[in-house]
Each structure stands twice: as structure tokens, then as C-alpha cells.
From Swiss-Prot:
EC number: 3.1.1.41, 3.1.1.72
SUPFAM superfamilies for the chain: alpha/beta-Hydrolases
Catalytic activity line of the entry: Deacetylation of xylans and xylo-oligosaccharides; cephalosporin C + H2O = deacetylcephalosporin C + acetate + H(+)
Signal peptide location: none
Biotechnology (record note): Used in the pharmaceutical industry for the chemoenzymatic deacetylation of cephalosporins and the synthesis of novel antibiotics.
Homology family: Belongs to the carbohydrate esterase 7 family.
Entry's Gene Ontology cellular component terms: cytoplasm
PANTHER family according to UniProt: CEPHALOSPORIN-C DEACETYLASE
Taxonomy, superkingdom: Bacteria
Binding of substrate, residues: 91
Protein name from the UniProt record: Cephalosporin-C deacetylase
Species per Swiss-Prot/TrEMBL record: Bacillus subtilis (strain 168)
Tagged with keyword Transmembrane: no
Length: 318
């Protein structure tokens, strides 16, 4: 195995100090209050999809900054209420064709919404970047916590849960969240910022332990941050940017999660280095389990899909 991060025995105890600023909790309290001022106004448009036993819709709702967020919603074609899953996709990694993932979950009995992250697909992005940014979204608005791109994204993830839980066909007491990479980070963030989810599954979560990530990640998108620092050589700029990131580090949000969590990581993951995933995992203070795949990188891990199905069956159907 090509080892580029810490050995497994060190990873298991890797728990860096949290970097949350003093006003961390207040920031998120006020952010959620801002979100609450926006009426969701969900809109469902039927979609003709070639599968029996499921109904499919294009779901759109209003979120933070009045952005119109959209995605695919698939529901079992039988009487509810049904358990539900909200799924978040990876960084710039969603295509309209991924509708089949939501259909697959619906065929397993879950009303499922796949949120399309603002700006990365067909969801509207109303955030601004007054100081410019590197290619991609990682540094958009990075010099101010109030304008940072992921403030809107995290709140969009929360709003998705609020919308789904309001539907008559959904059992609001049996809703789970899941996603991989960026989607894994959003899974932890949503479970930390909302009391709606009852279970969370995060595949190799991104957006964690930024201070280490920019030193050890070998592939994008963490490296967008490094690129921004190269172009903006001021030490003050780096200090301010890292302070902003601390508000969005899922390592700092982890202890707010109160529901069971299942997580995965491959030990040769060059995108979300294992240490950054363990950093978030080791700060969780809830019932948790981390599946380690020694010979996998940042990729689809077949065995974990079965683990995920079993986990949601236990916590949302059991």
C-alpha cells in the first residue's frame, strides 16, 4: 500500500484541537435565523422516469439569500408515510443522470431527495466574492465568514431537510442524511445544524481539518486554497482565510451531532486524506462507526454500500 498519511494506529488516535472561534455557536445561531426568514416555497414538477413502483419529481425550493435550490425527489409509489433520505453530492460531481440514485433509494422504500449544490449544477448561487477567488468554489468569499460560499451551502442542506420533513408522504421521525466527499461533509454539517436527521452516513467526508488538509492533500479541491494563497501572498490574507474556514470545518461541528453516524475512509485517499476524516470522526461524541478500507482511495467502495443499506434499515426502518 502507498502510505502518504499517518499510519493507521496513529490515525485512530488523531484528534487535533478544534479551531472554532469564540463566536462559533453564535454565528451558526444567527445564520439559521437568517435562513428562517426565507420562505421555502417548495415546488414539485413530475418527471417521466422509466421505472415502475416509484414517482419522480424535480423539487425546487428557496433557501439562504433567496437562492432557488433544486434537485431530484423520488418517492415509493405506495401509501406512506415513508422513511426518507436526503442525499448530498460530491464536489462538482453531480449530473442530471444521477437521478437513478434517488430512484434506487426509493425502490428500497425511502422517499429520497438529492440536493444539487448551489452553483455546481442547476441550483442558483447568490453568494458573492468581493475579493476574488481561485478556480472553483473553495475560496469564493473566503475572507469573510458572512460571504463565504459554504455558508449558503450548509444552510441549503438544512433547508432540504426542512422541506422534505414537511411532506405528507414522509415520516418526519425517520429521516436520514448521506453523501460522499463534499456530500459527506454536508452530511455531518446538516446533522450538526438540524435536529431533523435521525441517522447519518458519510463516505470519506470533505471539509474537515483544513489546516492539515492543505498540507497533505495531493489532489483537488483542497488545493484550490493553496492556489489562492499563492496568488495572494499576504500573510494577513492567509490568517483571515483560515479563520473563515474554521467556521465551516466539520471537525468543529462534529460534537454537535447527536444521532448515530456511519463513516468510511480509504487509506490511500489523496483527495480527503485519512487524517482529516479521522479528525472529524474522533470529535464525534455520539454512537459512531468508521469503516476503514485499506486498499481504496477516493472512489466508489462497493462493500460500504451494503453497510449503508443495513445502517439505514436499522435506524430508519427498525
Amino acid at each position: 500500500m502507498q502510505l502518504f498519511d499517518l499510519p493507521l494506529d496513529q490515525l485512530q488516535t488523531y484528534k487535533p484541537e478544534k479551531t472554532a472561534p469564540k463566536d462559533f455557536s453564535e454565528f451558526w445561531k444567527l445564520s439559521l435565523e437568517e435562513l428562517a426568514k426565507v420562505q421555502a416555497e417548495p415546488d414539485l414538477q413530475p418527471v417521466d422516469y422509466p421505472a415502475d413502483g416509484v414517482k419522480v419529481y424535480r423539487l425546487t425550493y428557496k433557501s439562504f439569500g433567496n437562492a432557488r435550490i433544486t434537485g431530484w425527489y423520488a418517492v415509493p409509489d405506495k401509501e406512506g408515510p415513508h422513511p426518507a433520505i436526503v442525499k448530498y453530492h460530491g464536489y462538482n460531481a453531480s449530473y442530471d443522470g444521477e437521478i437513478h440514485e434517488m430512484v434506487n433509494w426509493a425502490l428500497h422504500g425511502y422517499a429520497t431527495f438529492g440536493m444539487l449544490v448551489r452553483g455546481q449544477q442547476s441550483s442558483e448561487d447568490t453568494s458573492i466574492s468581493p475579493h476574488g477567488h481561485a478556480l472553483g468554489w473553495m475560496t469564493k468569499g473566503i475572507l469573510d465568514k458572512d460571504t463565504y460560499y459554504y455558508r449558503g451551502v450548509y444552510l441549503d442542506a438544512v433547508r432540504a431537510l426542512e422541506v422534505i420533513s414537511s411532506f405528507d408522504e414522509v415520516d418526519e421521525t425517520r429521516i436520514g442524511v448521506t453523501g460522499g466527499s463534499q456530500g459527506g461533509g454536508l452530511t455531518i454539517a446538516a446533522a450538526a445544524l438540524s435536529d431533523i436527521p435521525k441517522a447519518a452516513v458519510a463516505d470519506y467526508p470533505y471539509l474537515s481539518n483544513f489546516e492539515r488538509a492543505i498540507d497533505v492533500a495531493l489532489e483537488q479541491p483542497y488545493l484550490e486554497i493553496n492556489s489562492f494563497f499563492r496568488r495572494n501572498g499576504s500573510p494577513e490574507t492567509e490568517v483571515q482565510a483560515m479563520k473563515t474556514l474554521s467556521y465551516f470545518d466539520i471537525m468543529n461541528l462534529a460534537d454537535r451531532v447527536k444521532v448515530p453516524v456511519l463513516m468510511s475512509i480509504g487509506l490511500i485517499d489523496k483527495v480527503t486524506p485519512p487524517s482529516t476524516v479521522f479528525a472529524a470522526y474522533n470529535h464525534l461524541e455520539t454512537k459512531k462507526e468508521l469503516k476503514v478500507y485499506r486498499y481504496f482511495g477516493h472512489e466508489y467502495i462497493p462493500a460500504f454500500q451494503t453497510e449503508k443499506l443495513a445502517f439505514f434499515k436499522q435506524h430508519l426502518k427498525g
